[in-house]
Amino acid sequence: MELRQVKGNTWVLDSWELIPLYKLDAHRCVLLDTGTWDQRDELEAALDAAGLDPVAILCSHAHMDHMGSNAYFQKTRGTQVIMSLGEAAQIMSPLGIQLQYYNFNMGAFGQYPELGTAPCLPDRILLPGEREIEIGGAQFEILPTPGHTIDHISVRTPDDVLYLADAMMTGRILHHAKFPYAISVGEYLDTLVKLREVKAAE
């Protein structure tokens, strides 16, 4: 997992799935998502190699490929987990995760032990209408981008870098998935229209 600079203090950990972060200083960072649970060791090793302690996770949405290590970092490092209200409600308990992943029954938590590490009580919940959050002296803009999930958010870093997460898919992904997953196709399309008007440096 390679740490690559995007702009200013905004960096990305480059693996098969990108994990963005914002450096608050030489030793502290804010993670924008944590990837999948099977990236955990690689992610932690990359952070340790860079001398970075994740003081917060500003999580885009409650899918396992974006919040797979939220609970782990919260428990082992005291990392603050920050999520929007609609996403936080889905991952506070095994039942919430089961309701989100309706193809899982409660027995799946025994069959897939990784699911047992996923439930997480966020330290801070972004309420509807909250458009900014201050973390460690840095100001982040919150953009509501629902559709892929019920309360998906995108984040603008202080460097004017916009992290869209799954609000918009790359051409590489669309080549394989012609129409990506959306819990609400109407809201997803509305979000895409809205994003056409959003400007950012990166």
How should each PLM-predicted stretch be described?
Residues 2, 11, 53, 80, ...:
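Conserved beta-strand segments of alpha/beta enzyme cores
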Residues 22-26, 108, 168-173:
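Short, basic/glycine-rich phosphate-binding loops at helix/coil junctions
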